[in-house]
């Protein structure tokens, strides 16, 4: 079982496809809850989260503080961090289940996973953001916050969770390093 935490800021439109991609996981019994942690939106982000049955929190605190606070409230042993607008590719549920089972059979506390970035060919009309994200991933050769992060609560707590800054998503990926991803 896993809990999803989605970071938002004026994300009423981009939140919808992210939540839609999670529906099959909820129907399959894999996804227990979704927490939307917001940075003070002035649009209908809260209403979208409410209609979808998500728990919604809003704060002017830095992103890392919001993510850490949201993580403290979830019930599942696995946490999936996503940004609003992230749409996991088809097959992500099977990949996540396989990864979680494999990690639990080996050293479950020592591994985390990221998802593949969608290639521009998988996007109906790729925009500049999708193309730049793919190019950045190819050049950097490292995981990006746009990919999402699947991590056990034990490992999350062991590394101290998200740092307090606004660059918290990239910082936690750097702290995890390639050996744990």
Residue ranges and their predicted role:
Residues 59-74:
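Glycine-rich, basic loop-to-helix element that forms the pyrophosphate-binding segment
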Residues 1-3, 33:
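Cell-envelope/extracellular polymer assembly enzymes that use nucleotide-activated donors
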Residues 38-46:
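A conserved acidic beta->alpha catalytic loop
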Residues 79:
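Short aromatic/hydrophobic "clamp" motif used to bind/position activated sugar donors
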Residues 10-26:
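Short, well-formed alpha-helical segments that are part of the catalytic scaffolds
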Residues 91-124:
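Conserved donor NDP-sugar-binding/catalytic core segment of glycosyltransferases
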Residues 111-123, 133-151, 157-158:
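A recurrent flexible, glycine/aromatic-enriched loop bordering the glycosyltransferase active site
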Residues 44, 64, 82-99:
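Acidic donor-binding/catalytic loop of UDP-sugar-dependent glycosyltransferases
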């Amino acid at each position: 079982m896993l809990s999803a935490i989605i970071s938002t800021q004026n994300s009423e439109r981009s939140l919808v496809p992210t939540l839609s991609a999670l529906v099959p996981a909820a129907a399959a019994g894999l996804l227990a809850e979704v927490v939307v942690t917001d940075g003070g939106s002035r649009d209908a982000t809260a209403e979208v989260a409410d209609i979808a049955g998500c728990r919604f929190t809003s704060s002017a605190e830095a992103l890392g503080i919001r993510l850490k606070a949201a993580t403290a409230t979830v019930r599942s042993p696995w946490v999936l961090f996503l940004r609003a607008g992230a749409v996991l590719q088809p097959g992500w549920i099977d990949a996540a289940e396989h990864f979680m089972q494999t990690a639990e059979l080996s050293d479950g506390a020592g591994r985390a996973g990221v998802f593949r970035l969608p290639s521009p060919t998988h996007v109906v009309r790729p925009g500049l953001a999708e193309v730049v994200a793919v190019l950045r991933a190819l050049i950097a050769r490292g995981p990006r916050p746009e990919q999402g992060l699947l991590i056990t609560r034990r490992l999350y707590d062991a590394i101290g969770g998200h740092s307090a800054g606004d660059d918290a998503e990239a910082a936690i990926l750097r702290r995890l390093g390639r050996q744990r991803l």
